[in-house]
Amino acid sequence: MWAGCHPDAASLLRLLLAALLAAGALASGEYCHGWLDAQGVWRIGFQCPERFDGGDATICCGSCALRYCCSSADARLDQGGCDNDRQQGAGEPGRADKDGPDGSAVPIYVPFLIVGSVFVAFIVLGSLVAACCCRCLRPKQEPQLSRAPGGPRLVETIPMIPSASTSRGSSSRQSSTAASSSSSANSGARAPPTRSQTNCCLPEGTMNNVYVNMPTNFSVLNCQQATQIVPHQGQYLHPPFVGYTVQPDSVPLTPVPPFLDGLQTGYRQLQAPFPHTNSEQKMYPAVTV
C-alpha cells in the first residue's frame, strides 16, 4: 500500500537511515590499541577522536611506537602489523613481567646492603653487651681493690704487738724485782749472813746502783748460778738513767732519828705490834737516810 500510494516517501526513509548510520560511524572513529614506547613504558589505548582533537580526527595515525588520531586517510596506521601492542606475560595470571608496568627490576646493591646492615648490627649489639658486662662486674672488683691496701697495714701493726707485750712484761718484771729487792733487803735486816751470801753472788758495783732491778730468784740460787743469770747493768735500766749511779759522798747524811737502829746500813724494817706468820710476807716501805 505504501509503495502504490507514496513511492517517494519510502525512498526518503531509506536515505534517512543511511545518513544516521554514516553519522554514527563518523562520530565513533577508530580505536588505537595500547603499545610499548621506545623507553619501554606501556601506553594505554584510546578511542578517536580524543578529548582535545577535532571532530573529524577519527583515524588512528602515526607509527607503532607513537600513535595519535588524525583525519587524513593517507596517514592511517595499520595496527595489525605492530608487535608491541601486547604485554609480555599478560596471558599468565598472577605473573608480572619485569618489562611491564606492574613489574620492577631488583637493584644489584640490595643484597650487599642487607649483608652490611646485618654485620653492623652484630657489631653494635656486641659492643652493648660488652659494656653491660663491664659495668656489672666493676662493683664486685672495687671492694677487692679496697681491701688490698689493708693487708700491709695489718702486717705493719703486727710487729707492734710484741713491743707492747715486752713493755708490759718489763714493767711487770720491774715491779716484781722491786718488790723482791725490798723483801730481800728486809730479810737481810733480820739475817745479815744471808744478805752477805747474796751480795757475794752479784758483781761489784751492782748493789750501789739503786735503779738495778734484781730478779726474785737470786736469794735461792748459789753464787755460780746467780753470776750466770745476772744481766747487764743497762738491760733493766730506764733509758734516761742509763750510765748514772748514786753518789754516796755527794749528799750529806742526816742525823738518824731515835726510832731507827743505827747499826743497820741506812734502813730497817718497821716492827708490827702483832707478828705475822711465815706464809704471809708483808711488804713495808724502806726509809732511806
UniProtKB/Swiss-Prot annotation:
InterPro entries: Shisa (IPR026910), Shisa_N (IPR053891)
Amino-acid biosynthesis as UniProt keyword: no
Originating organism: Bos taurus (Bovine)
Family recorded in the similarity comment: Belongs to the shisa family.
Gene (name only): SHISA2
GO biological processes: negative regulation of fibroblast growth factor receptor signaling pathway; negative regulation of Wnt signaling pathway
Signal sequence annotation: 1-27
Reported function: Plays an essential role in the maturation of presomitic mesoderm cells by individual attenuation of both FGF and WNT signaling.
Cell location: Endoplasmic reticulum membrane
Cytoplasmic side: 126-289
Residue spans, topological domain Extracellular: 28-104
The protein, known as: Protein shisa-2 homolog
Keywords tagged on the record: Developmental protein, Endoplasmic reticulum, Membrane, Signal, Transmembrane, Transmembrane helix
Pfam families, A to Z: Shisa_N
Residue stretches spanning the membrane: 105-125
GO cellular component: endoplasmic reticulum; endoplasmic reticulum membrane
Principal place of residence: endoplasmic reticulum
Disordered as annotated region, ranges: 81-102, 162-198
Keyword Transmembrane attached: yes
Membrane topology: Single-pass type I membrane protein
Compositional bias (Low complexity): 163-191
